[in-house]
Amino acid sequence: MKPTGTDPRILSIAAEVAKSPEQNVPVILLKLKEIINITPLGSSELKKIKQDIYCYDLIQYCLLVLSQDYSRIQGGWTTISQLTQILSHCCVGLEPGEDAEEFYNELLPSAAENFLVLGRQLQTCFINAAKAEEKDELLHFFQIVTDSLFWLLGGHVELIQNVLQSDHFLHLLQADNVQIGSAVMMMLQNILQINSGDLLRIGRKALYSILDEVIFKLFSTPSPVIRSTATKLLLLMAESHQEILILLRQSTCYKGLRRLLSKQETGTEFSQELRQLVGLLSPMVYQEVEEQKLHQAACLIQAYWKGFQTRKRLKKLPSAVIALQRSFRSKRSKMLLEINRQKEEEDLKLQLQLQRQRAMRLSRELQLSMLEIVHPGQVEKHYREMEEKSALIIQKHWRGYRERKNFHQQRQSLIEYKAAVTLQRAALKFLAKCRKKKKLFAPWRGLQELTDARRVELKKRVDDYVRRHLGSPMSDVVSRELHAQAQERLQHYFMGRALEERAQQHREALIAQISTNVEQLMKAPSLKEAEGKEPELFLSRSRPVAAKAKQAHLTTLKHIQAPWWKKLGEESGDEIDVPKDELSIELENLFIGGTKPP
């Protein structure tokens, strides 16, 4: 039922939330913060505003927004942190009225759990952040979320037990970062100062986990802030609850705790709390009755445990025996099946051998009966013919085997020879290129220095040559024409050399292609071993070659299919004309690699 006299600002916000799309809802809900901040704290007007917010399901909208992924919310962590403040302030001091059961049993635990989940997400983002400014901003948002959770727990103490038992809270407490860890431990200290009685109402496992984490941070963290907070937490737990103090004294899990605390530095800021904690954990005179009780309790637990294990083992004995019998029978049946199969195979082999012997005996009897019909003078001739036929068959098989063996050996050696030639050709070509590069890029070494005697001798030879071959004087115009002719011939030479190099490269490419084709033909399988795709490897990649091959194939077919009287007078070198229509049949179906479709 909607309350009367609702604040018009709440009505307008609720109407905007109902009409706006989902992505705009978080920004609209932030308007509630302005309304709450300008209203005096503790006034009846603020209480009425909180009731209106709850009645129009704006708190539920805040919960739904906080349960979404932070990356999808407009404004990111800034919007989320402000929504946590709005949610905590609205839930504290609210009188739900008729929906009190739903509010206390569902909404408040869900809000506390959402705050813890947001804390874990902020912790993960803080750890993954690389920049210091981003870390400071995330730490500020984390502090806002923890403050909102503490504000909510301060107004609803019954939620402390749920928070302490939550796995998310334990994960936050196990943070290795100094800032996150100190913030969580300060929140735990403030929670225990509000109501430490809930610490004994939580499960044994959760209590041990909290104690283990606090003690671990006390001894393993070098940060004095975390160590001071951990010491204060342990002191607060031990002073508030005698059960926890007894647990820290007598439990085997915390054996040697006092000795480790005594070794801590005494000049620190928390040395006073440390001394108080050591004093609480100092050994006292334990009564023999308590030790005897503990011993009897341990013996009783062991007896019950051993009895339970024995009864459990006895219950499993029949099933174990049944399983053993089943496995034994299955193995025995498999063994019998194997023995029967072996016997059947042996019987089959024996029957085949007997049939073979029987057939051989019948064939020999038939031969003897046929020999009885033959004239006695022809028997020796028959035996001689049989021996010759047998010898010929043996020789034929032996020669075939020898030729096949020699062929395979020669084929392998020929392949190796071709490979060696190819490698040598490639190596020689590579060395020639290297020598050519060295000649092109070789530095100028200058001329060898001449001796005085050699210089005089050369000068004398030049003077003699000039004296014997007096040249006619050449004009400047003739000299220039001669120079132009020389340049033209030099240019013609260089252009011809480029064409010769291209022709040489083309010849080398053709030789390499021919070598590849020869090697491919040598490696070609026999007709019996050939598969469907292997003949496609021998199709030419050149259209003229493919057309010429098609023409030769059709010529051969026409020559074979022609009647005998048409072949009279033909010579082996004569060519047969093939129509172009027949030549173009299926030519487009040939695989021509390296070409583009028209």
From Swiss-Prot:
One of its GO terms (biological process) is cilium assembly. Keywords: Calmodulin-binding, Ciliopathy, Cilium biogenesis/degradation, Coiled coil, Cytoplasm, Cytoskeleton, Leber congenital amaurosis, Nephronophthisis, Phosphoprotein, Repeat, Senior-Loken syndrome. Residues 287-598 are annotated as: Interaction with CEP290, BBS1, BBS2, BBS4, BBS5, BBS7, BBS8 and BBS9. It comes from the Eukaryota. Induction: Down-regulated by DNA damage in a p53-dependent manner. The modification Phosphoserine is found at S572. GO terms for cellular component: centriole; centrosome; cilium; cytosol; extracellular exosome; photoreceptor connecting cilium; photoreceptor outer segment. Residues 294-317, 318-338, 387-416, 417-437 form the IQ domain. InterPro entries: ARM-type_fold, IQ_motif_EF-hand-BS, IQCB1, P-loop_NTPase. GO terms for molecular function: BBSome binding; calmodulin binding; enzyme binding; protein-macromolecule adaptor activity. Changing A549K: Disrupts interaction with CEP290, no effect on interaction with BBS1, BBS2, BBS4, BBS8 and BBS9, abolishes ciliogenesis. Ubiquitously expressed in fetal and adult tissues. Localized to the outer segments and connecting cilia of photoreceptor cells. Up-regulated in a number of primary colorectal and gastric tumors. SUPFAM superfamilies: ARM repeat, P-loop containing nucleoside triphosphate hydrolases. Residues 1-157 are annotated as: Interaction with BBS1, BBS8 and BBS9. It is found in: Cytoplasm, Cytoskeleton, Microtubule organizing center, Centrosome; Cytoplasm, Cytoskeleton, Microtubule organizing center, Centrosome, Centriole. Residues 530-598 are annotated as: Interaction with BBS1, BBS2, BBS4, BBS7, BBS8 and BBS9. Signal peptide: none annotated. Residues 336-373 form a coiled coil. Its main location: cytoplasm. Pfam families: IQ. Involved in ciliogenesis. The function in an early step in cilia formation depends on its association with CEP290/NPHP6. Involved in regulation of the BBSome complex integrity, specifically for presence of BBS2 and BBS5 in the complex, and in ciliary targeting of selected BBSome cargos. May play a role in controlling entry of the BBSome complex to cilia possibly implicating CEP290/NPHP6. It is linked to Senior-Loken syndrome 5: A renal-retinal disorder characterized by progressive wasting of the filtering unit of the kidney (nephronophthisis), with or without medullary cystic renal disease, and progressive eye disease. Typically this disorder becomes apparent during the first year of life. Leber congenital amaurosis 10: A severe dystrophy of the retina, typically becoming evident in the first years of life. Visual function is usually poor and often accompanied by nystagmus, sluggish or near-absent pupillary responses, photophobia, high hyperopia and keratoconus. Interacts with CEP290/NPHP6; IQCB1/NPHP5 and CEP290 are proposed to form a functional NPHP5-6 module/NPHP6; localized to the centrosome. Interacts with calmodulin, ATXN10. Interacts with NPHP1, INVS, NPHP4 and RPGRIP1L; these interactions likely require additional interactors. Associates with the BBSome complex; interacts with BBS1, BBS2, BBS4, BBS5, BBS7, BBS8 and BBS9. The IQ domains mediate the interaction with calmodulin. This is IQ calmodulin-binding motif-containing protein 1. It comes from Homo sapiens. The gene is IQCB1.
